[in-house]
Amino acid sequence: VIELNDRETLINTLSPFSSSEISVASIIQSIDKLDKLSEADVIQELVSKGLPNDKASDALSAIKNAKPSSNLAEIIESAKNLGVSESTLRFNPALARGLDYYTGMIFEGKIPGESGSVGGGGRYDRLIESLGGPSIPAVGFGLGFDRTVEVMQTKGLLSATQSTQVLVTIFSPSLQGPTLKVAQ
């Protein structure tokens, strides 16, 4: 399952709850923990950051009822038009991936019945520039290799190690020694 959200949805939904005491970025960081903490714990964290209890509850309610931005809705529609099944895509209005450098779409790959994600990423238009490079919009993702292998083993998707035949050629007499070592 691919969970999707975008910064526009997060910022537009949660900005009304920010103040001089608590930034929208800080609210987003707390909301992003909804997959790990209870709603009561997230509300308590928001209150500890300076958001009044009623506003913290309202922020949580607002994000749970948020709709995708027009940009994200277009991305979801494009994915469907490319043959991605509707059951594979899930809008998650609380998904933020905990990083402020995302500027557009955000996504995480999850395996149904398993906790955590096996990968994630998104759009980050200013990241390369912030690291001293040119101003280049970018999209990227990271795959949790260990997590992916763990899930594949749990689900019996990895076959036992098998030997295979390999042809190793010697391109030059001077490479005969190293080539024979590789062949072993």
Give a label for each model feature.
Residues 1, 21-25:
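Short secondary-structure capping/junction motifs at helix and strand boundaries
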Residues 2, 6-12, 17, 35-184:
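Positively charged, Gly/Ser-enriched RNA/tRNA-binding surfaces
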